[in-house]
Regions:
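Alpha-helical solenoid repeat scaffolds of the TPR/TPR-like class and their adjacent stem/linker regions
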Residues: 1-182
Length: 182
């Protein structure tokens, strides 16, 4: 397809996913931004006159959401790294994830739900959360920055659930996972 139409966004997007699956992160993430131009894209990019954040820019950085909950959770592994490079970090995220993120990341990060208004006076630069790996996950070694769990469960809820599940004497517990369709 790309030999016929070199700028065919769907093919470039699919190629980026292929590169990522082959662990060629540098090439895969470099082409990942074509997701905005693919024919079945339903995400609307954040509109702002402020510039995109890049690693050489220091200031107040707004990270805005895209894709589904699973993607937001996956990309959030990079938050500690961009936090270190920003003067102030502001994250707009699905409301359901705010408590989890508040437990898991530095306490001075500011969070907004997806329906809350953020004005351009509040930030200097912005970036979609799915674009962060372009700067922080270029090689397999870069994933080692997270040498353990990066999300923290609500220990009270987890303990209550564990007690409830174990109260009937059952020895085997089965975890649940989901698969997103977006």
């Amino acid at each position: 397809a790309l030999s016929i139409k070199t700028d065919y966004a769907d093919a470039i997007w699919n190629r980026s996913l292929a590169y990522l699956s082959l662990k060629d992160f540098n090439t895969g993430w470099a082409q990942y931004d074509k997701r905005w131009k693919q024919s079945n894209n339903t995400s609307i990019p954040f509109q702002s006159s402020k510039p995109y954040w890049t690693p050489n820019k220091s200031g107040r950085v707004l990270i805005w959401p895209e894709q589904g909950l699973g993607d937001l959770i996956m990309f959030s592994s990079v938050i500690p790294e961009i936090y270190k490079q920003s003067k102030k970090l502001i994250i707009q995220i699905d409301d359901r994830l705010i408590p989890l993120f508040k437990r898991s990341f530095p306490t001075d990060i500011i969070y907004y739900g997806v329906k809350e208004k953020i004005t351009e006076e509040q930030y200097d630069f912005h970036i979609p959360i799915g674009s962060l790996p372009l700067y922080f996950r270029k090689e397999l070694q870069s994933f080692k920055h997270n040498n353990g769990p990066y999300l923290k469960a609500d220990t009270s809820r987890a303990d209550n659930l564990r007690s409830k599940l174990l109260s009937d004497g059952t020895k085997n517990l089965i975890g649940i996972s989901w698969h997103s369709t977006n």
